[in-house]
Design a protein with these regions (language model features):
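Alpha-helical membrane insertion/targeting regions
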Residues: 1-231
Length: 231
């Protein structure tokens, strides 16, 4: 019994550390990426379709609302807030879903369809935004049905999609760095195709690995719960 309690305490400490790290990284990416879209003379960090006048407005809405989701999302997973301040937990959840994920996913679909990054990022971003919306809807329906276990699982899946915005930047830097030795030979000294390759790989990797990691985590969590119930 003592060993079991100690194991649970260690797991709880690791969980708090992981959530704190996710919160810090999320805030850092918001401070880095979002402000460029909130000034009058927007300096977009991605290509804009000049022939589509509503491309930039949808991109601004997507950046701002996704930033809200990244800022408030991690606080949904602090157990102390859920247990001791349930009203705050519910308010933060509503802000996350209604001011963050809902407008962020819908505007993101439009921005994805108009992307200049190529067909692979286009399809990947559209699928991400559809899943982002769908998982939020499932989480909302679960909590309305008072199925809190399913609500937590769908919220974790949803935030894994949200957090892809953080990992995309990390993987982009990594894929650029590993290709730099190929710049002069394979790419003929042209950095643009190197960046395009790195960006496509980062988009796919950030989304696929985040969602795969979360499914593995949830499956292991359910397995541990089943074993714990048998003990």
């Amino acid at each position: 019994m003592t060993a079991t309690l100690e194991t649970r305490r260690r797991a709880a400490r690791r969980g708090r550390t992981a959530v704190a790290a996710v919160a810090i990284l999320s805030v850092a990416i918001v401070l880095y990426a979002v402000p460029a879209y909130l000034v009058p003379d927007v300096d977009s960090r991605v290509g804009i379709r000049e022939d589509v006048p509503f491309h930039l407005p949808f991109l601004v809405v997507h950046a701002a609302t996704a930033g809200i989701a990244l800022l408030v999302g991690p606080f949904q997973f602090f157990g102390s807030i859920r247990r001791n301040h349930p009203k705050i937990h519910r308010v933060v959840g509503r802000v996350y879903l209604l001011a963050g994920v809902l407008p962020g996913s819908l505007s993101g679909i439009v921005a994805a369809v108009l992307t200049t990054a190529g067909p692979v990022p286009l399809v990947t971003f559209v699928l991400l935004d559809v899943f982002w919306f769908y998982s939020a809807l499932r989480a909302y329906r679960a909590v309305r049905a008072r199925d809190f276990a399913a609500h937590q699982e769908w919220m974790l899946r949803n935030f894994a999609a949200t957090f892809a915005a953080v990992n995309l930047r990390v993987y982009l830097g990594l894929f650029i760095a590993v290709q730099l030795p190929l710049l002069d030979g394979h790419y003929g000294g042209d950095f643009e195709p190197l960046f395009d390759t790195a960006y496509t790989a980062a988009v796919v990797s950030s989304i696929a690995l985040n969602l795969a990691f979360m499914e593995i985590y949830l499956r292991r969590k359910r397995t541990r719960g089943t074993l714990g119930a048998k003990d």
